[in-house]
Amino acid sequence: MTDSAQSEAHASAALPLSVSARLGRLQFHLSGKFRVLQCADVQDGLRISQDTIRLIASACDAVRPDLVVFSGNQIAGYEKVFAKTFQRRRWQESSNISASDKKQLVDKVHEFVAKLMKPLEDRSIPWVVTYGNHD
């Protein structure tokens, strides 16, 4: 294990955890509280900014949420990389989008979500994503 990987593993082991993260299931605190951190309108591209990742990580460390909800518009779907599959209006017929283009889009979205959720995965924090009109 490299020094940086070892340092990262040690740092993540020392992260503050919520009750839910410690128990491995969603759980109210004895006080009756349940902390939800909501994030919305990240609107980042496939090359997600490290500032965004650090902000999410810092918010999780400060709040120690039991659940993080990303409530729409995480992906800047209007970026050039999505041009082949972007629909301006959902109710309009899509142009002939190939199966290959659709698969590439799904792969890109999965890659983006994995990067965005890494701070939560590192902290064992449950999360949920809903998509918005830019995703």
Describe each PLM feature range.
Residues 1-50, 56:
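Mobile, glycine- and charge-enriched loop segments
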